[in-house]
């Protein structure tokens, strides 16, 4: 697709971890050319400052010397990401460009009233907002009062599926380790039902964030035989784990439309997740997985046991995921 009139503002998708990087990487394969300015990397405060300053200079060059640019496609999230991207949105409008804000964030509703006003003043300038789900589309329309919000669900590259044979039931978690992704709820379930899972289930955790805290909980509660931390995984290692897993779990409290869930579904895995963001639009309870309210640990337990004890159910749900 010829896109010489589009400038994309995002992250350094070649080195940054996470879902937004994965989305931008896919876009880079069919935008021709992929005009791109990276505003952030995910390592070192000084490096982040240098990358942002470089991005600011690059953006001015694009605006001043590339008159063919008509549309600025801004990939942004909530928190610090939004405040960085706000600068580029305002500059793009100053140069008379059309701006598309592609929202990957899941915590805009937690902004204070003062910050929410700043968000509204910025986003109302955008010619279009891309939301990841109908629920987020509704939020932008009713809270930000934007009149041109469209839903484009996240995209992923199709995987190479080659299942790995194993004995125990394997449940996979991929995501940032912390409260928002529900990792502590899952650990509480493992602790409470340790005897049920021992010798039957292997829980594999992959991600960054509260790494040491999670490791310590596993060690203190003697979960080493059923829970195994994989570190940050991508590339071939992630492909291997998704081929190894029997099911995927992400008991989040806030989400847009998580790439990890889409990737798991592309590997024909049943998914255990929660009723947040765009997840209910792709996950149907009892069909391609189980879905529950955030924090419902009993529901998490029963979902895991249902898949663990019924291989036919697990396989059938997985087929319906893809």
Which ranges hold each PLM region?
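Nucleotide-activated donor-binding/catalytic signature segment of Leloir-type glycosyltransferases, i.e.
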Residues: 215-233
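Conserved acidic donor-binding segment of nucleotide-sugar-dependent glycosyltransferases
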Residues: 285-286, 290-297, 306-311
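Conserved donor-binding/catalytic core segment of Leloir-type glycosyltransferases
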Residues: 7-9, 163-192, 203-206
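Short hydrophobic beta-strand element within catalytic cores of glycosyltransferases
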Residues: 270-273
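Aromatic "clamp/platform" in nucleotide-sugar-dependent glycosyltransferases that forms part
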Residues: 253
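Donor nucleotide-sugar binding/catalytic pocket of nucleotide-sugar-dependent glycosyltransferases
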Residues: 124-160
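A short, well-ordered alpha-helix in the C-terminal region of glycosyltransferases
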Residues: 299, 306, 313-322
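Glycosyltransferase donor-sugar binding loop
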Residues: 40-41, 174, 202-215, 231-232
